[in-house]
């Protein structure tokens, strides 16, 4: 069985540990700078192999003004709270039918989760297809404002 002592074990205790003159391994200049220094110069090949997308622009960021922000409300929430909305006079009774404007509640879209137990006229800027069909099935009207 061969027991070969490794080079670093042999050099322990020596002044320079294989680095030649002690001045040679002093400071960051020995390794070409600190951190990612020289990524576009003398460490360019390292960057190409290990971090190829470091330089340049990638992707696209949509301008925030073009993104439409929806604040939706479900039919189940409207149905559960209709008595409270009538008491607070947010929803009103006109010609025997309840009329509710969801923009007064701070919402701008009505979604179709749940169902309506009473006929309600709901006014909103946007409706989902399922919400329109469920409102009309209950005898109400989906009015786009």
From Swiss-Prot:
A biological process term (GO) from this entry: translation
Biased composition (Basic residues): 1-13, 22-33
Pfam families the UniProt entry points to: Ribosomal_L27A
GO MF term list: rRNA binding; structural constituent of ribosome
Keywords of this entry: Ribonucleoprotein, Ribosomal protein, RNA-binding, rRNA-binding
UniProt keyword annotation of Zinc-finger present: no
Gene Ontology CC: cytosolic large ribosomal subunit
Residue segments, region Disordered: 1-41
SUPFAM superfamilies found in the cross-reference section: Ribosomal proteins L15p and L18e (SSF52080)
Subunit structure: Part of the 50S ribosomal subunit.
Record-stated family: Belongs to the universal ribosomal protein uL15 family.
Described purpose of this protein according to its UniProt entry: Binds to the 23S rRNA.
Protein known as: Large ribosomal subunit protein uL15
Organism: Methanosphaera stadtmanae (strain ATCC 43021 / DSM 3091 / JCM 11832 / MCB-3)
Phylogenetic classification of the source organism: Archaea, Methanobacteriati, Methanobacteriota, Methanomada group, Methanobacteria
This protein's encoding gene: rpl15
